[in-house]
Amino acid sequence: MKTTSEIRQSFLDFFHSKGHTVVPSSSLVPENDPTLLFTNAGMNQFKDVFLGLEKRPYTRATTAQRCVRAGGKHNDLENVGYTARHHTFFEMMGNFSFGDYFKHDAIQFGWEYLTSPQWLGLPKEKLYVTVYETDDEAYDIWNKIVGVPTDHIIRIGDNKGAPYASDNFWAMGDTGPCGPCTEIFYDHGETFWGGLPGSPEEDGDRYIEVWNIVFMQFNRLADGTMEKLPKPSVDTGMGLERMTAVMQHVNSNYETDIFQTLIKEVAGLLNVTDLDNKSLRVVADHIRACSYLIADGVVPSNEGRGYVLRRIIRRAVRHGNLLGAKEAFFYKLVPTLATVMGHAGEVLTQKQAHIQKTLKAEEEQFARTLERGLALLEDALTKVENNTLSGEVAFKLYDTYGFPLDLTADVCREREITIDEAGFEAEMTAQRERAKASSNFGADYNNVIKVEGQTDFIGYDNLAAQATIVGLFSNGKAVDTIQSGESAVIILDQTPFYAEMGGQVGDSGLISTEICNFAVNDTQKYGQVFGHIGQLTSGSLSIGDKVTATVDATRRVAITANHSATHLLHSALREVLGDHVAQKGSLVSENILRFDFSQPEAISKSQLEEIERIVNRKIRENIQVTIETMDIESAKKKGAMALFGEKYGDVVRVVGMTEFSIELCGGTHVQRTGDIGLFKLVSEGAVAAGIRRVEAVTAETAIEWLHNQQKVLQQSAEFLKADSNSLVEKIQQLQDKAKRTEKELQQLKDKLAAQAGSELVKQANKINGVNVVVQKLENVEVKSLRTMVDDLKNQLESAIVVFGTVADEKVNLIVGVTKDLSSKVNAGELVGAMAQQVGGKGGGRADMAMAGGSEPQNLDNALKFAEEWIQAKL
C-alpha cells in the first residue's frame, strides 16, 4: 500500500519523465496577488504565466502545492471534522502546459498515470470521466484514443444558471482566460450511496472526483464574446488526500496514513480511547494548516490572514478542551507532523521551534478566556428562543472573549441550535461605524485622488501658511466646488499639515478664507499629495481659491511630545531587554503612544520600571534634539535605526538625541527632551507570538493619568474604610473572608443537593426493571441541574433521569441516561420531543441533553409525556 509521501513523489516523478520541470510549492501567502487571501490552487503561482504577463524558462511544470481554504470565498472551516473530505489544508498535485501540449497529451498523461501498473494502477472500469457538453474534441479523445467506453463518459452542460456556468467550464474571472474542463471520478462501489456526476445523487460518497484538467483555450471579453487564445494552456489538479484514500482503500481522508498518525498522536497526548471522535479529526486537520501558515510567515492577529490563523488555532484548542485537554497540547503535534509529511515536511522541521513557540503562546493566551467564554455560551444556550442564539451574544463572545463566530457555531451545531448571523453582522457593522465615526469621512479615496505635481510640506517650522487649492474630492469623486455642510478632501499646493506617516497620526486644524471655514479632522497622503479630510462648515470653496491653512497647535505639540518619547522608549527597550528588540509597528497620537516590538516573552514589572526610569531620566537631562539630512549610507554608518514598514530614498532625515537614540524619521519632534515633561507606561502585553506592545502617555496627559490613579486610590480607601497606605492589606483581608464565605456556601449547596439527590433516589420508579426519575424541581439553578443529573446517574448506576424547572417564565429541561441504556433511550431525542411540548427546541448527546421552552404552563404535560415515551422505548 502506497503512503501519501510515495504517491506525492510518484506524481512528480511521472510528469518529470514527461518533460515537466518540478517546481517547488509556493508560499501559502500569495505573492503580488491582493485578490487572494491564501494560495488555494496549484495554478496560483502561475497566474501571470497564463495571463501572458510573465515568461518562465520552461513550458511544462509539475508541482505539489500546499493550499489553504479557510476564510474568504473558499471557506471549508465549519465542515472540517464532520465530513470525510473537507480540510483547511490540503495538497494539490498539478501538471501545467504553458502553450505547449494540449488536450491529447493532457488526457493521455492523466490516464496513463492513474491506470498504468507502473504508476497507480487503478482499475479502468472504476473510472468515469466528464466533459463539457459541447467539447466533442475531449469526448472523442477519451472514447476513440484512450478507449473509455461511452457509458463511462458523461457530458455536463451549463448547470449553474448562465451560459458557460458549469461544473465542467472554468474561468479565472468574469473576463479573461477560460475554457472547458474534463474530470475523472473514482467509483468506490455499491456499498456507498451516491449517483454519477450530473445525477440528482451526485453529492453522495460513491463517485469521487480525483482528477481535473482545465483546457484554457478562450479569452472571454466584457461583452461575453469568446476569443480563441493563440497558445492554449493546460492546468491539471489532483487532490493528494483524496487520491491517497483511493489508493489505501478507505472512504474517508481521515483514515489515510497521515491523518491516522496525527489522530493517534492527539489521542495519546490527551488519553482519548475513542479514535472515531470528531474532535480528533478537527485537531489533526488544523495542526497542518496552522503549522504551514506560520512556517510561511503568518502571525496570529485580529485581521486578515492572521485572524484566519487565529480562528483555526482557537477552534483546535476548543476541540482539545472537549477531548479533556487541561494544558497546552496543540504545539506538541508539530514534530510528528513534520515527520509524517515526508519531503513536504522539511519546511516545518526548519522552522519547528518558531512554529511551536507561536502555537503555544496563542493557545495559552486563548485558554485564559476560553473557560469564561464557554460558561457564558452555556448559560446563553439554556435561554435561547426559537432554537436560535442571538447575534448580540455571539458578538459579545467574539468581542470580549475572542470567540470567532465559527467556534461559537461549532458549539451550537452540537446542540442543533442556529446562530442569528444577520444580528451578528449588524453588531459588527455598528462597531465598525463607531470606529470610523470620529473621521466623519468614510469614502476610500486611495484610488480616486489623481492630482498632478506634489504638495510641499512646510510644517516642520510652520503651523500656518497661505496655500492654493489644487484639488477637491467629495462623495468619492473629483469636484470643482464644495458647499457648506459637505465632507471633502482638499489638496493644497503646500501645507503645514503633517500627513499620517511612520505611525504618527495626521494633523487637524482649519483651512479658511475670510468667509469660509473647512474643519480638518485628519490629513492623509495620497501618492505625492496631502489630502486634508474634513467638512466645510460655512461658505463654499473651489479649485484655485487662496486659503489659510492653520494646524491645531495644541494637538500638534502633544503629538510631537509623544513621537520624541517613542524614540526614547525604543532605545530604553533595547537597553533593558536586548538588541533583539525591533520595532514592528507604532501609533503616535495626541493622547497616547503605542509601540509594538519583537520580544519572545513577557516583560517583568522590574524591567518595565527600569524602562520608565530611563526614559524619564533622559527627559530630565533636557537633551537637544538634532535633525540632519544625509544620504542613506552615512545614516547607516552613524548607527541610525530604521522604522518598521517605512521605505527610504537615497537622502534621509536623521533624528538624534545624543548617542542614546538615532533614528531615521520623517515625523515632528520636540526641540529638547525636557519638552516632553513626563513619561508614564500605562500598559504592556502580547499582540501576537513574539510581539509585545507597550502604551504610554506623556506631558499633561501623564499628569492627568496620575491624578486619576490617585483619585481611584483615595476613593477605594474611603469605600473600604481604610487608610490608603494600608489598602492592600485591607483588600487581602476581604478576599480571605470572601473565600471562606464562598467555601461555606458551596458546602451548604453540596449538602442540600446531596439531600435532594437521596430523596430523588428513593422516588425512582421501575419501568421494565430500569430506574427512572422524572421530576419537576423547584428553586434549582439551571447550572445545578447537570450536577444533580450526574449525581443521580452515579448513585443509581443504571438509570434515566429527567428534570424540568421554571425560572423567569422559561422552561429548562435536562435528560441524563447512563451509558448502558443510551442505545435504547437517546437523551437528545427525548429532550427534543419534550421541548416541543413546551414551545421550544433542544438536543444534545445520547447520554446528556438540555432544552428550553417558553410555555411553563405545559411543563407537567411534558414530564408526563417523558414517562410515556420512556416506557414505550423500554
Swiss-Prot record:
One Gene Ontology MF term:
zinc ion binding
Show the catalytic activity.
tRNA(Ala) + L-alanine + ATP = L-alanyl-tRNA(Ala) + AMP + diphosphate
Per the record, the major location class is cytoplasm
Entry's EC annotation? 6.1.1.7
Q: Which PROSITE patterns match?
A: AA_TRNA_LIGASE_II_ALA (PS50860)
Location within or outside the cell:
Cytoplasm
Q: How is the cofactor bound?
A: Binds 1 zinc ion per subunit.
One GO term under biological process is:
negative regulation of DNA-templated transcription
Q: Required cofactors, per record?
A: Zn(2+)
> GO CC annotation: what is one?
cytosol
Keywords (A to Z) from UniProt: Aminoacyl-tRNA synthetase, ATP-binding, Cytoplasm, Ligase, Metal-binding, Nucleotide-binding, Protein biosynthesis, RNA-binding, tRNA-binding, Zinc
InterPro entries attached to this UniProt entry: aa-tRNA-synth_II/BPL/LPL, Ala-tRNA-lgiase_IIc, Ala-tRNA-ligase_IIc_anticod-bd, Ala-tRNA-synth_IIc_core, Ala-tRNA-synth_IIc_N, Ala-tRNA_ligase, Ala_tRNA_ligase_euk/bac, DHHA1_dom
What NCBIfam families does this protein's entry cite? Answer: alaS
- According to its record, what is known about the domains? Consists of three domains; the N-terminal catalytic domain, the editing domain and the C-terminal C-Ala domain. The editing domain removes incorrectly charged amino acids, while the C-Ala domain, along with tRNA(Ala), serves as a bridge to cooperatively bring together the editing and aminoacylation centers thus stimulating deacylation of misacylated tRNAs.
> What does the protein in this record do?
Catalyzes the attachment of alanine to tRNA(Ala) in a two-step reaction: alanine is first activated by ATP to form Ala-AMP and then transferred to the acceptor end of tRNA(Ala). Also edits incorrectly charged Ser-tRNA(Ala) and Gly-tRNA(Ala) via its editing domain.
The UniProt similarity line reads:
Belongs to the class-II aminoacyl-tRNA synthetase family.
Output this protein's name: Alanine--tRNA ligase
Q: Please name the source species.
A: Actinobacillus pleuropneumoniae serotype 7 (strain AP76)
